[in-house]
């Protein structure tokens, strides 16, 4: 009833469009011709029954939806931050930046070549050991803070200085248990696992030394932006206690220069994913602006904020990197840090903000809001683990598309007009078939012309009594 009322209200509007006029003409012709066919068929009551019976339509979904994924990299955004990667279970590398040719190796082993009796004891200043190399100084500071080393309470760090005859410096952390309640070894081991990922650990032959030395970067392992995020999160505790809740962090969108744009914009492909995959533009950003409870939205805001921050920095010095670090630490919410820490401690699948999956409609190109591809035991889950979730997401995507299409159609063409056109076409097709088939409408005397008024009964006589009972054979005739 509501559709009928809205239809009459929109009569002056829909005739302005050619499509609506064509639909109206087709509807009118189909109805008139259908009524004529119905009249000629001789079975009006049956036709009305066929029209009124079984007016239902089913719509199946899933034919044009596919399960797809993409991988993010932030090398172009965090190009000034160290990049971590693991070569094997005992050898790790920290690249000074994403564009640097220098690196810091972190070895976890059972032997150490640096002795405190012959070397220097590090108390927070690395200049004497690194040869006043500012790049290595701040990288060492980041790594040691990421390992949660406390210079005031933890065992001392020994180093072998960089000399003219020896271009290599070495730092050594002794993880030997000093007393029964000493948890320094477990703390460093947990921090290494958090920074570089899980590694094989033999309880019978434990590693008791961590050695760090300068080296060169020659693509020994594959970098991932997850490592940079882990290092940022590990260093976040240093500024966490001194910062308060700020009101400037909101979910409003802006352009590349920082100008507020509530409607959102399309992020560049190079910043998110490779050009051959998919650029998530206004659609995904608009969804994040309305509902920002997913990891994908967190990463988009993190990318966007740091892109603006990096473009406003004047140089690539240590002060600029520290400023960026504090900005990122302020950006990452306490809930985000706590959630990932708890998931790691509970050993349940967690999000590493690297790979995301989404449901894509192959015909229209519309897609759902990407969700994180979970990781468990250092490896991505199988596609089958997301089956129920992505089927449900597919249903939501179809429902959203149908709702959007309904609103657009109702705005341009009244839905009732489309329904009338459809059912009138069904009506015309049905009556045309009945007209072609035809139904017997009266009796004839076999082998003779039809007598008027030719309404004969089964005895061959007219029902009105004009003719006598002829008792001749009768046949049914169709009247066309």
From Swiss-Prot:
Extracellular side: 2-17, 59-419
Residues in compartment: Cytoplasmic: 34-58, 441-480
Site (Important for GP-C-mediated membrane fusion): 33
Disulfide bonding pattern of the chain: 85-221, 266-279, 288-297, 351-372
Alphabetical UniProt keywords: Disulfide bond, Fusion of virus membrane with host endosomal membrane, Fusion of virus membrane with host membrane, Glycoprotein, Host cell membrane, Host endoplasmic reticulum, Host Golgi apparatus, Host membrane, Host-virus interaction, Lipoprotein, Membrane, Metal-binding, Myristate, Transmembrane, Transmembrane helix, Viral attachment to host cell, Viral envelope protein, Viral penetration into host cytoplasm, Virion, Virus endocytosis by host, Virus entry into host cell, Zinc
Molecular functions per Gene Ontology: metal ion binding
Covalent lipid sites (N-myristoyl glycine): 2
A Gene Ontology biological process term: receptor-mediated endocytosis of virus by host cell
Family in the record: Belongs to the arenaviridae GPC protein family.
Name of the featured protein: Pre-glycoprotein polyprotein GP complex
Organism in which the protein naturally occurs: Cupixi mammarenavirus (isolate Rat/Brasil/BeAn 119303/1970)
């Amino acid at each position: 009833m509501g559709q009928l009322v809205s239809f009459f209200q929109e009569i002056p509007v829909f005739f302005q469009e050619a499509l609506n006029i064509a639909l109206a003409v087709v509807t009118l012709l189909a109805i008139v011709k259908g009524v004529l066919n119905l009249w000629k068929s001789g079975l009006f009551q049956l036709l009305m029954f066929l029209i009124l019976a079984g007016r239902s339509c089913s719509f199946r979904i899933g034919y044009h939806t596919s399960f797809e994924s993409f991988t993010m990299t932030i090398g172009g955004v965090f190009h000034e931050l160290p990049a971590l990667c693991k070569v094997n279970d005992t050898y790790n590398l920290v690249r000074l930046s994403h564009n640097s040719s220098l690196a810091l190796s972190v070895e976890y082993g059972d032997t150490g070549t640096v002795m405190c009796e012959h070397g220097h004891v590090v108390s927070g200043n690395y200049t004497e050991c690194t040869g006043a190399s500012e790049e290595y100084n701040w990288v060492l500071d980041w790594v040691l803070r990421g390992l949660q080393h406390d210079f005031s309470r933890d065992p001392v760090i020994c180093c072998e200085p960089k000399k003219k005859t020896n271009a290599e410096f070495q730092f050594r952390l002794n993880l030997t248990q000093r007393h029964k309640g000493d948890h320094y070894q477990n703390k460093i081991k947990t921090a290494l696992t958090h920074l570089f990922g899980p590694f094989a650990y033999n309880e019978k032959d434990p590693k008791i030394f961590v050695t760090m030395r300068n080296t060169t970067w020659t693509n020994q392992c594959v970098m991932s932006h997850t490592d940079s995020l882990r290092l940022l999160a590990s260093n976040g505790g240093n500024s966490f206690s001194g910062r308060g809740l700020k009101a400037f962090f909101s979910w409003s969108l802006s352009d590349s220069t920082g100008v507020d744009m509530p409607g959102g914009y399309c992020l560049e492909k190079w910043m998110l994913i490779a050009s051959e995959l998919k650029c998530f533009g206004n659609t995904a950003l608009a969804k994040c602006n309305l509902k920002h409870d997913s990891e994908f939205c967190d990463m988009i805001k993190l990318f966007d904020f740091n892109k603006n921050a990096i473009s406003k920095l004047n140089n690539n010095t240590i002060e600029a990197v520290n400023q960026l670090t504090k900005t990122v630490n302020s950006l990452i919410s306490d809930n985000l840090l706590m959630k990932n820490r708890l998931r790691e401690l509970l050993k349940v699948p967690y999000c590493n903000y690297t790979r995301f999956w989404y449901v894509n409609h192959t015909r229209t190109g519309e897609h759902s809001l990407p969700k994180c591809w979970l990781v468990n035991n250092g490896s991505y889950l199988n596609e089958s683990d997301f089956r129920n979730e992505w089927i449900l997401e597919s249903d939501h995507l179809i429902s959203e598309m149908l709702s959007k299409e309904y609103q657009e159609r109702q705005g341009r063409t009244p839905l009732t007009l489309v329904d009338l056109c459809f059912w009138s076409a069904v009506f015309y097709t049905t009556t045309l078939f009945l007209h072609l088939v035809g139904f017997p409408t009266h009796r004839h005397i076999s082998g003779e012309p039809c007598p008027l008024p030719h309404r004969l009964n089964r005895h061959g006589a007219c029902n009105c009594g004009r003719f006598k009972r002829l008792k001749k054979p009768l046949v049914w005739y169709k009247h066309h």
